[in-house]
């Protein structure tokens, strides 16, 4: 297995797809990396030469990936919460952040329904 950015990428997949197993590399960025390094996207990972793997490692080092990217995103959310802006408060309360309605829907973000007893008449 080739190891890129601390992740073992699957041997049987095409390089173009296998690179997407690294957090922070999607299909578009994978294609960009392969174009810059000159590696054929249709090659299987198991068929890559050591020099190809080294090229890919070098190309991925210029991006923020894996743990660093997760930490960066976490710090951005923490900053929003610390300054007390609306987005930060919505994140803290586990509500939709981007203006969606919450009277109905938003079940994924709010969690499962809390049962409320009906009022007797």
From Swiss-Prot:
Keywords: Ribonucleoprotein, Ribosomal protein, RNA-binding, rRNA-binding, tRNA-binding. PROSITE patterns: RIBOSOMAL_S13_1 (PS00646), RIBOSOMAL_S13_2 (PS50159). Residues 100-121 have a biased composition (Basic residues). One of its GO terms (cellular component) is small ribosomal subunit. GO terms for biological process: translation. It comes from the Bacteria. One of its GO terms (molecular function) is tRNA binding. Residues 91-121 are annotated as: Disordered. Belongs to the universal ribosomal protein uS13 family. This is Small ribosomal subunit protein uS13. It comes from Prochlorococcus marinus (strain MIT 9301).
């Amino acid at each position: 297995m080739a190891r890129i950015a601390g992740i073992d990428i699957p041997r049987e997949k095409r390089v173009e797809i296998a690179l997407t197993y690294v957090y922070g590399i999607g299909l578009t960025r994978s294609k960009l990396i392969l174009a810059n390094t000159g590696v054929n996207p249709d090659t299987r990972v198991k068929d890559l030469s050591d020099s190809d793997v080294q090229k890919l490692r070098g190309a991925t080092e210029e991006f923020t990936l894996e743990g660093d990217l997760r930490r960066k995103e976490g710090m951005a959310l923490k900053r929003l919460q610390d300054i007390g802006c609306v987005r930060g408060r919505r994140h803290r309360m586990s509500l939709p952040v981007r203006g969606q309605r919450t009277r109905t829907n938003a079940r994924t973000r709010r969690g499962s329904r809390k049962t409320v007893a009906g009022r007797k008449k």
